[in-house]
From Swiss-Prot:
Its cofactor is Zn(2+). It is a multi-pass membrane protein. Zn(2+) binds at residues 140, 144, 219. The keyword Transport does not apply. The active site is at 141. Keywords: Cell inner membrane, Cell membrane, Hydrolase, Membrane, Metal-binding, Metalloprotease, Protease, Transmembrane, Transmembrane helix, Zinc. GO terms for molecular function: metalloendopeptidase activity; zinc ion binding. GO terms for biological process: proteolysis. This is Protease HtpX.
């Protein structure tokens, strides 16, 4: 699927599990709300920002993307010139530009801030899209960077992680107390940890729905930004080209990918809106 979910959520899931272990070892009492909030905040935001800070390295390593330092051909020269022009128009620093091997038509942007980003495109995109269509895709990715989508996503995920950690322990303590007959609450038996683990999984699903809703919202904004930088008709043409190429992506995540989630995915868990909705939104917009 064309998603940005797997690595990012895997990192945050690992943090949730680690938080459970560490808080248990440190004896953090779920009845001590201040201590719980502090620990949940540290672990909740920790995973998000570690993932964000490592996002460029992870993206390069997982896709095999090669950064263009000295253009070797006309295509690479065009890529650098186009990204430089769009970055200047968007008011951001020049991102690193990379190409990775992949048959799918796709591109992504990632990085910890607006002036230290990475924009990469697949060889499938370069082989199957016209320059006008590719220009629109690059504009879409530059818009992600200019909008600060990566840092905003990390902040949102940090809040959601913290919420999941706290709520799972508070509700888990209540359930464990009710089951054990301990009216003072805060049971620390094996059942308590099982309950908390299950609740983290359940609440984590709801948190994922929220983060994916935000992801879909930001795709519309990035489409509008791409239309402003490259032209609305070019942006529409790029999306229409994607409709003709529904191949499966091998992209990992924590990257702002241009594609869409697989057609079999439930809409609540889709990181991108359906292509027809994105095209309709562009047709209804006032961007030239």
């Amino acid at each position: 699927m064309f998603t940005r979910i797997a690595l990012f959520l895997a990192t945050n899931l690992a943090v949730l599990i680690l938080a459970s272990i560490v808080m248990s070892l440190l004896g953090v009492d779920s009845r001590s709300m201040s201590g719980l909030l502090v620990m949940a905040g540290i672990f909740g935001f920790g995973g998000s920002f570690i993932s964000l800070l490592l996002s460029k390295w992870m993206a390069k390593r997982s896709t095999g993307a090669v950064v263009i330092t000295e253009p070797r051909n006309q295509t690479e020269r065009w890529l650098l010139a186009t990204v430089e022009r769009q970055a200047k128009a968007a008011g951001i620093g020049m991102p690193e530009v990379a190409v990775y091997e992949g048959p799918e038509i796709n591109a992504f942007a990632t990085g910890a801030n607006r002036n230290n980003a990475l924009v990469a495109v697949s060889t499938g995109l370069l082989h199957n899209m016209s320059e006008d269509e590719a220009e629109a895709v690059l504009g879409h990715e530059i818009a992600h960077v200019a909008n600060g989508d990566m840092i905003t996503m990390a902040l949102l995920q940090g809040v959601l992680n913290t919420f999941v950690i706290v709520l799972a322990r508070v509700v888990g303590g209540i359930i464990d107390s009710a089951l054990s007959g301990n009216r003072e609450g805060g049971g620390r038996g094996f059942a308590y940890f099982i309950i908390v683990f299950v609740l983290e999984m359940v609440f984590g699903l709801f948190a994922t729905m929220i983060s994916m809703w935000f992801s879909r919202h930001r795709e519309f904004r990035a489409d509008a930004g791409g239309a402003s930088l490259a032209g609305r008709q070019k942006m529409i043409a790029a999306l229409e080209r994607l409709q003709l190429n529904h191949g499966q992506s091998t992209l990992p995540t924590q990257i702002a990918a241009f594609g869409i989630a697989g057609s079999t995915a439930k809409k609540l868990f889709m990181s991108h809106p359906p292509l027809e909705e994105r095209i309709a939104a562009l047709r209804a917009s006032t961007v030239a």
